[in-house]
């Protein structure tokens, strides 16, 4: 009898826990994805803060030349970064217990791998939590679908690209100037500016900014007057009110006359779908582009593609970009190799005598 009562009590405790986890009445929804999201994101955030402040220099290139990234080792907010895991580690799983000591783990950039893997798990669970909350509230699932774009982008630069290049040392550093360095080296090695998927991503981000500004300014300019001149126009809206707060017909008429009739949406639902879909699809393509360039399927190469009747090269903008790429490639990891791959692949000219 005692055993039965204990089992019922434990089942009741588990049931209450399940109800609490999945309750939409909590101030912040947890959900089953949140059970994994909370510890992973807390771990990633805590280690990032500690490492950004105090981590010792990391031998990123695996050539016994440590690079300092933390504030206590001479950096500021702009130059500081979590330095990627050493090329000596490659793609090996490198938790603390795999190193001979904590000093060795820090020297080889163990915190970067710890942060990145926990962060990617955390943001993936955040996306799942968005879907889970939408499901429990009877909403459609498109919030999580939209969030999949930045998740895909983060996964591309922190996981897919290192896998394709064979080492976590090629991942994006976790810092401002480190991100810029990653972008410059990526251009030098993969010619990303000439990749059509990157072009679609630029159109997505810049176009999304333009459409967001256009939509916001049109709505703000066609608000239905509910206030006097001495009050803020924002006071004319009450949360949850049934009537429209702006005149979509006026906005449609204005924009249709500014450009042409069919450039303006006359359906609020299709308009907002477009505003969401445009940047999301663009960022999807960018993430896909990073993932293909990870395996060296690079941007277009139009170098020396125009010649005159005598066979002499007429430089185009592609040749100017190529020269810049070579310059950037020569400068990065300058002590890890003598020549960039593009130059090393060219046969040395024959000499007489």
Swiss-Prot record:
Catalytic activity as recorded in UniProt: 2 a plastoquinone + 4 hnu + 2 H2O = 2 a plastoquinol + O2
Residue positions assigned to the propeptide: 345-353
Residues the record lists as binding Fe cation: 215, 272
Keywords for this protein: Acetylation, Calcium, Chlorophyll, Chromophore, Electron transport, Herbicide resistance, Iron, Magnesium, Manganese, Membrane, Metal-binding, Oxidoreductase, Phosphoprotein, Photosynthesis, Photosystem II, Plastid, Transmembrane, Transmembrane helix, Transport
Protein name in UniProt: Photosystem II protein D1
Annotated function: Photosystem II (PSII) is a light-driven water:plastoquinone oxidoreductase that uses light energy to abstract electrons from H(2)O, generating O(2) and a proton gradient subsequently used for ATP formation. It consists of a core antenna complex that captures photons, and an electron transfer chain that converts photonic excitation into a charge separation. The D1/D2 (PsbA/PsbD) reaction center heterodimer binds P680, the primary electron donor of PSII as well as several subsequent electron acceptors.
Annotated chlorophyll a ChlzD1 binding sites: 118
Classification via HAMAP family: PSII_PsbA_D1 (MF_01379)
Record-level GO cellular component terms: chloroplast thylakoid membrane; photosystem II
TM annotation in the entry: 29-46, 118-133, 142-156, 197-218, 274-288
E.C. numbers: 1.10.3.9
Keyword Nucleus: no
Residue numbers binding pheophytin a: 126
Site (Stabilizes free radical intermediate): 190
Site feature: Tyrosine radical intermediate: 161
Site (Cleavage) location in chain: 344-345
